[in-house]
Regions:
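A short beta-strand motif characteristic of beta-propeller blades
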Residues: 16-22, 58-64, 105-112, 155-161, ...
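Beta-rich, blade/repeat-based domains predominating
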Residues: 23-37, 66-84, 113-129, 159-178, ...
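Conserved beta-strand positions in repeat-built beta-propeller and related beta-rich domains
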Residues: 34-35, 40-46, 80-86, 130-141, ...
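A short loop-to-beta-strand structural motif that recurs across blades of beta-propeller domains
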Residues: 49-51, 87, 145-148, 188-190, ...
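Short loop/turn segments immediately following beta-strands, especially the blade-tip
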Residues: 92-99, 192-199, 296-300
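Hydrophobic alpha-helical segments and helix pairs
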Residues: 98-160
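Loop/turn-rich, solvent-exposed surfaces of beta-rich toroidal or solenoidal domains
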Residues: 188, 192, 209-242
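Blade-level signature of beta-propeller repeat domains, shared across WD40, Kelch, NHL, RCC1
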Residues: 264-310
């Protein structure tokens, strides 16, 4: 792979991801790898669809949903937890592979007191909980979104984090005591101490500042070596940051708007989006909205954590 110069002067490995699924999602997001079934799941938020892809067979299935699906998580009983607009749901998707419309059950309503938000990014924590943020639906993106934890024992508990416009990048270190997150309108990824049992956070600080003008931090995943991979919207790249914040690797994407990433063994999968691209931009990047893949050279994936559901 070619080597690129980083502003620090250190060499950085750079590579180009290739098309894995020509999904052409309006807003692909929230991609997960299920190591038990060896399939990918992700959402097209604007199309109100849940996607499933089996890399071995090449088979892809989509389900229609009644509301935008902002995020999803694997559950301990084989179901998926689904963050649908203003409520958390659970669905047995594998039992509904022959259906077009996905049947779900409601777990918890979210922010009934705030009509101008919807569920956005989220991820299972290391101890059976689920942490997610809500996105501002105001035209000016005023920061009214909040961060929440959901557990079977306690239901919803709000995390004492700053209000956000577009919460993203939620992921956890191996111990589950450090949480990474961001507000995509600001070019930085934050981190804090996180306690699952009490739903408390502390010691909020900056993990990394993005170096590229116009780049927005989007979805992230932590690998088996503790490094954070972050999809950077508008920059056409995923960046791997070492635990100390140094840049280790850059993966370019054939689309300017990569949105989320996940590791499956030695492969990095990346969702992307077509929303906001005019005809000229789409002609220049016809694969926008697809899922891209990049071989990492060694197995870096951690098994995705699972939410304990009632």
């Amino acid at each position: 792979m070619p080597t690129a110069a980083w502003p620090s002067g250190e060499p950085v490995t750079a590579a180009l991801a290739t098309l894995a699924v020509d999904s052409r999602c309006a807003l692909g997001e929230g991609i997960l790898w299920c190591e038990r079934r060896r399939v990918l799941y992700w959402t097209d938020i604007l199309a109100k669809e849940l996607w499933r892809h089996d890399p071995a067979s090449g088979h892809t299935h989509t389900w229609s949903l009644p509301a935008p699906l902002g995020c999803l998580a694997l559950a301990d009983d084989g179901r998926l937890l689904l963050g649908l607009a203003k409520a958390l749901h659970a669905g047995d998707v594998e039992a509904q592979l022959g259906r077009r419309d996905l049947l779900t059950t409601t777990l918890a309503d979210v922010e009934a007191d705030e009509p101008m938000t919807r569920i956005n990014d989220g991820r299972a924590d290391r101890h059976g909980g689920f942490v997610f943020g809500t996105k501002s639906e105001h035209a000016d993106l005023r920061p009214v979104g909040r961060f929440h934890q959901y557990t079977a024992a306690h239901g919803l508990r709000e995390l004492a984090l700053p209000r956000a416009a577009i919460p993203n990048s939620i992921c956890f270190d191996a111990a589950g005591t450090t949480m990474y997150f961001c507000d995509s309108v600001a070019p930085r990824i934050l981190r804090c101490r996180y306690d699952t049992a009490t739903a408390t956070v502390s010691d909020i600080g900056v993990f990394v500042e993005l170096d590229m003008p116009g780049a927005e931090p989007d979805g992230s995943v932590i690998d088996d070596e503790g490094a954070l991979w972050n999809a950077q919207w508008g920059a056409g790249r995923v960046v791997r940051y070492l635990p100390d914040g140094r840049v280790d690797r850059i993966v370019r994407t054939p689309a300017a708007q990569p949105s989320c990433c996940v590791l499956a063994g030695d492969t990095l999968y990346i969702t992307s989006a077509r929303v906001g691209l005019d005809a000229a931009a789409l002609a220049d990047q016809p694969l926008a909205g697809g899922v891209f893949a990049h071989g990492t050279g060694r197995a870096l994936a951690r098994a995705e954590d699972r939410v304990r559901l009632p």
